[in-house]
């Protein structure tokens, strides 16, 4: 997974506190569960080696998010269950055009374009036509990834335990209703704007390293 770019609720906002409390509160149900901060992963597999590269990623993400005139809005919906460690229990996020556009830009600028430039013999020395061809291919690749692979969500549990038993599901859903209110999945739960965090996700979850953040 390497380094990932997270979109988080505004720090210490009510939704931040509710999600963080939920993540902590569900840990006893899963013996191998880890604690982590609430977030939506925009993209993974980012390669950064210097503080300058960290700053570039965060500043570029903020610039892209600020292109939304009315502010960047996140909408959460119903709880889902999966088989994968990082998608065991999660809240689905509405894939709005603004969110998908942001994820595509991040994938293109921070993952696919650096890969393409490193594979090119000398990108900067190429003709404008050659660079445009690479740029187009990278853009198409990012658009395809966004369309076919990107699935925005807010994880509540990391675990290898599978399946999630019916009794545990009932407990989880009761706790979610206690925290967010009955019918939370249809009540407009979410947040506006927030924080970008660049996180090195290597090794055990408790060893993940936050490389930098930007509030917007």
From Swiss-Prot:
Entry GO MF terms: 2',3'-cyclic-nucleotide 3'-phosphodiesterase activity
Keyword Hydrolase: yes
Protein name: 2',3'-cyclic-nucleotide 3'-phosphodiesterase
Pfam families found in the cross-reference section: CPDase
The gene coding this protein: CPD1
Gene Ontology CC, one term: Golgi apparatus
Lineage: Eukaryota, Fungi, Dikarya, Ascomycota, Saccharomycotina
UniProt source species: Yarrowia lipolytica (strain CLIB 122 / E 150) (Yeast)
EC number assigned by the record: 3.1.4.37
Homology family: Belongs to the 2H phosphoesterase superfamily. CPD1 family.
Active site: 39 (proton donor/acceptor), 153 (proton donor/acceptor)
């Amino acid at each position: 997974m390497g380094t990932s770019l997270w979109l988080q609720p505004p720090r210490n906002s009510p939704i931040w506190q509710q999600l963080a409390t939920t993540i902590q509160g569900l840990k006893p149900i899963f013996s191998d569960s880890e604690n982590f901060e609430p977030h939506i992963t925009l993209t993974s597999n980012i390669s950064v080696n210097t503080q300058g590269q960290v700053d570039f990623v965060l500043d570029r993400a903020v610039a892209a998010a600020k292109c939304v005139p009315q502010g960047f809005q996140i909408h959460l919906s119903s709880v889902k269950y999966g088989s994968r460690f990082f998608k065991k229990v999660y809240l689905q996020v509405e894939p709005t055009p603004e969110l998908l556009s942001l994820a595509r830009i991040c994938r293109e600028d921070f993952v696919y374009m650096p890969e393409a430039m490193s594979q090119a013999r000398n990108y900067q020395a190429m003709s404008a036509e050659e660079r445009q061809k690479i740029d187009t291919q990278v853009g198409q690749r990012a658009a395809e990834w966004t369309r076919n692979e990107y699935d925005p969500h807010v994880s509540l549990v990391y675990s290898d335990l599978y399946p999630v038993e019916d009794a545990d599901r009932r407990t989880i859903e009761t706790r979610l209703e206690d925290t967010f209110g009955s019918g939370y999945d249809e009540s407009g739960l979410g947040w506006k704007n927030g924080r970008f965090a660049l996180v090195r996700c290597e090794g055990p979850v408790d060893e993940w390293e936050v490389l930098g953040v930007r509030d917007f």
